[in-house]
């Protein structure tokens, strides 16, 4: 029986660590001569060594000891690399345990494979200096700091047999998202979820400044973590052999504590919030590397952050120092003559799917399944009298989502920053609660329970987005709903997720993922008491600038349209789906059959709102969004009343990026299809929920440039719903006026009409200031048939 705390085992562990360090240094500098069998020549060295050293040895040490507890306790564990610029860590360790070669057979576990391994790192056509999708075992790249712990938690939700070993960099720990993440333990259910083991990796320095936690004593950190309901364990040193027994003891205690918490919770149904373990690990930055250089201290300082020794292909003056550094790891004790890791070292790596880089959770999840969806038609809204049935789209949709939860009790969740109720998803609470493991005050709290399918009890967009990202990367499904303006808080996170999807899609060995579904509600065009700060539809533009193969933007005009796109979104793969949906009472216009056609085609000509009678239109109205649709229809009523001979074509757009040219978007309409909708030269009055330049950019590649866009113009205030549209000239009166002015044969005889619209707008201006409400002709408007 293996003694995992014997000197013999620790000796093997030390060699494994040294081998990982050797491989990590080699990846920085070399592209040939990986075993240093001969003198280094210029052609052995990279022209521009690129990468980082400072965080590597400490993480390699942690990784080796995590392998030890995997072997000892048989746990399923995966590694989340929080510190920035530590790309070699997961590459080197997965190469040593064989999982890297399984993903990349050309990178063999011998001298030739090691040569390729070294050359490809931070090399054109090679691999990144972060834990990018090309890295086996990674679900978190770490290029943008702050999300490691939320990613670890998202992955272990509903995965009760998994442990996320989350290494938190001491620089990363200073970011806002990571600071919020220490409160994630309040949402981990010890019965139904797995566990996270955070390891705060304190090496003292960031890029050029000291890390703040490194200037805190163990007592201060203990107080901090106890206050956050964690149980801290400390390991510190710079002598690895002396540290091994202590590190092993702390790791053992942490794993046993996790197992004890879970055993008690699962056997006794004890959902009390536990004190989960956290490890605080202190080691020098750039540990085992050059001690000094040019009379300045390197190891243990910020100077170890990147490339410690100035050696490159054109500058071999100090190559002896590089050789001494690499030989300090005694490669002859680690690899045989052919470059294969020695059997006694290889044998201590976990085997099969117990290897962290081969854990299936890191490659699309453990037994992922599609959603079992209810029939969205069962929730259809009656639109027999168009526009007269007033409903809240999100409220209607919540009944559908309620039944999605019922049918998928372990692989579907809703996420948000304390906004699920505000966003009118009332139906969810008929069947589930907000998951909340912290103490609950039953007399005052609402819909809180230790187990629930809603995670929105932390007011942090970063947390909700981070949880959803890895919940989907590990094969499950979810939706993040948020106020429209504050999805912008995480637009950089969303960009990072897009970059992950794009790069992962290029890898044959990577399984695909359920799509990331974002719902933007509490939208800009009705904020009531919130005002200007809550008005920003810019995520539409932000995402439209990404590779369109991975982005969909849906703007359903009413509840049936929202329902009709649901199956397209719910079981979609490898995309980011953005849905703009209204939570306010709005007229319902489209039958379910019409909504299905719009969802399938992305857009459609609405015959009942058009007055062309099969002829060429004088003007094309197009609407993308709830308020744009409503105001366009109201404008059509005004125009038809005043100009009954005006031939109007009305188009409702649901899938916005379908309008992009196929030169930009392979899913886009051909020029011929586009012209059939929008003509080649007739004026197009395009009403849009977002910033106008996005529509202008779409039309730039098309024949028809006779475009008049009415969207969000960065005008806002605390005001009435209709006045928000007036401020941005997205209202029916401005639209009708612009329509007549854009058609030469109507513009001259329409002068009086244009003045009439101005007069109405002036009356509106005064009325809302006198009465605090919109004009009766606006609030009481209903659709009048134009055919």
Curated annotation (Swiss-Prot):
Keywords in alphabetical order: Lyase, Thiamine pyrophosphate
Cofactor names: thiamine diphosphate
Single GO molecular function: aldehyde-lyase activity
Enzyme category, top tier: lyase
Coiled-coil regions, chain positions: none
InterPro entries in the cross-refs: Phosphoketolase, THDP-binding, Transketo_C/PFOR_II, Xul5P/Fru6P_PKetolase, Xul5P/Fru6P_PKetolase_C, Xul5P/Fru6P_PKetolase_CS, Xul5P/Fru6P_PKetolase_N, Xul5P/Fru6P_PKetolase_ThDP_BS
Domain of life (superkingdom): Bacteria
EC number(s) on file: 4.1.2.-
Family: Belongs to the XFP family.
Listed NCBIfam families: PRK05261.1-3, PRK05261.1-4
Name used for this protein in its record: Probable phosphoketolase
Species of the source: Pediococcus pentosaceus (strain ATCC 25745 / CCUG 21536 / LMG 10740 / 183-1w)
Higher taxonomy: Bacteria, Bacillati, Bacillota, Bacilli, Lactobacillales
């Amino acid at each position: 029986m293996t003694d995992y705390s014997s000197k013999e085992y620790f000796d093997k562990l030390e060699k494994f660590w040294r081998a990982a360090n050797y491989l990590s240094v080699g990846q920085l500098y070399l592209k040939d001569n990986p075993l240093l069998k001969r003198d280094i020549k210029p052609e052995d060295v990279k022209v521009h060594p690129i990468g980082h050293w400072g965080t590597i040895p400490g993480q390699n040490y942690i990784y080796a000891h995590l392998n030890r507890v995997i072997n000892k306790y048989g746990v399923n564990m995966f590694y989340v690399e929080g510190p920035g610029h530590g790309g070699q860590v997961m590459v080197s360790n997965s190469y040593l345990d064989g999982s890297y070669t399984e993903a990349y057979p050309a990178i063999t576990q011998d001298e030739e494979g090691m040569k390729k391994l070294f050359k490809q790192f931070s090399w054109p056509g090679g691999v990144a200096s972060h834990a990018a999708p090309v890295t086996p075992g990674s679900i978190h790249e770490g290029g943008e700091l702050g999300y490691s712990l939320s990613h670890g938690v998202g992955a272990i939700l509903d995965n009760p047999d998994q442990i996320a070993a989350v290494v938190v960099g001491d620089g990363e720990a200073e970011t806002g998202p990571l600071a919020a993440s220490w409160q994630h333990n309040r949402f981990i259910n010890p019965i139904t979820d797995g566990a996270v083991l955070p390891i705060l990796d304190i090496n003292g320095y960031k890029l050029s400044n000291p890390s703040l936690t490194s200037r805190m004593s163990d007592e201060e950190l203990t107080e901090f973590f106890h206050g956050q309901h964690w149980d801290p364990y400390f390991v510190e040193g710079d002598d690895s052999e002396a540290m091994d027994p202590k590190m092993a003891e702390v790791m053992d205690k942490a794993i046993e504590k996790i197992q004890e918490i879970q055993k008690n919770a699962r056997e006794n149904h004890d959902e009390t919030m536990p004190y989960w373990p956290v490890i605080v690990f202190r080691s020098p930055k750039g540990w085992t590397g050059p001690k000094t250089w040019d009379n300045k201290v390197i190891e243990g300082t910020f100077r170890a952050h990147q490339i410690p020794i100035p050696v490159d292909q054109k500058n071999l003056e100090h190559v002896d120092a590089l050789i001494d550094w690499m030989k300090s790891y005694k490669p002859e004790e680690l690899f045989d003559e052919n470059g294969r890791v020695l059997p006694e070292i290889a044998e201590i790596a976990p085997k099969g799917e117990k290897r962290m880089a081969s854990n299936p959770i890191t490659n699309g999840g453990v037994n992922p399944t599609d959603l079992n969806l209810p029939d969205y038609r069962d929730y259809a809204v009656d639109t027999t009298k168009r526009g007269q049935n007033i409903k809240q789209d999100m409220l209607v949709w919540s009944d559908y989502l309620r039944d999605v939860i019922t049918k998928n009790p372990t692989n579907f969740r809703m996420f948000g920053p304390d906004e699920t109720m505000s966003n009118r998803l009332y139906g969810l609470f008929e069947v589930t609660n907000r998951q909340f493991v912290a103490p609950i005050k039953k007399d005052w709290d609402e819909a809180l329970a230790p187990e629930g399918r809603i995670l929105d009890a932390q007011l942090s967009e970063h947390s909700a987005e981070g949880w959803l990202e890895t919940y989907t990367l590990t094969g499950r499904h979810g939706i993040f709903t948020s106020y429209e303006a504050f999805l912008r808080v995480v637009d950089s996170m969303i960009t990072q997720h897009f970059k992950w999807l794009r790069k992962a899609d290029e890898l044959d060995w990577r399984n695909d993922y359920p799509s990331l579904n974002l719902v933007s509600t509490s939208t800009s065009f009705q904020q009531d008491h919130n005002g200007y700060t809550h008005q920003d539809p810019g995520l539409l533009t932000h995402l439209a600038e990404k590779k369109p193969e991975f982005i969909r933007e849906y703007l359903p005009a009413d509840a049936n349209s929202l329902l009709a796109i649901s199956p397209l979104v719910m079981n979609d793969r490898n995309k980011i789906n953005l849905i703009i949906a209204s939570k306010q009472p709005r007229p319902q216009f489209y039958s379910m059959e019409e909504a299905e056609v719009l969802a399938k085609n992305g857009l459609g000509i609405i015959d009942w709102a058009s007055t062309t009678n099969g002829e060429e239109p004088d003007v094309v109205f197009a609407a993308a969004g709830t308020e744009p649709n409503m105001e366009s229809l109201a404008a059509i009523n005004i125009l038809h009343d005043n100009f009954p001979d005006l031939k109007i074509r009305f188009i409702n757009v649901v899938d916005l990026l379908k309008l992009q040219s196929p030169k930009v978007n392979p899913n886009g309409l051909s020029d011929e299809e586009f012209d059939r909708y929008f003509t080649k030269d007739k004026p197009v009055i395009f009403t849009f929920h977002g910033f106008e330049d996005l529509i202008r950019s779409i039309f730039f590649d098309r024949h028809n440039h006779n475009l008049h866009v009415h969207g969000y113009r960065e005008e806002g205030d605390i005001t009435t719903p209709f006045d928000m549209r007036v401020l941005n000239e997205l209202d029916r009166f401005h639209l009708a006026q612009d329509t007549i002015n854009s058609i030469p044969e109507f513009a001259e005889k329409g002068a009086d009409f244009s003045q009439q619209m101005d007069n109405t707008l002036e009356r509106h201006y005064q009325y809302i200031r006198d009465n605090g409400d919109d004009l009766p002709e606006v609030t009481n408007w209903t659709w009048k048939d134009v055919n």
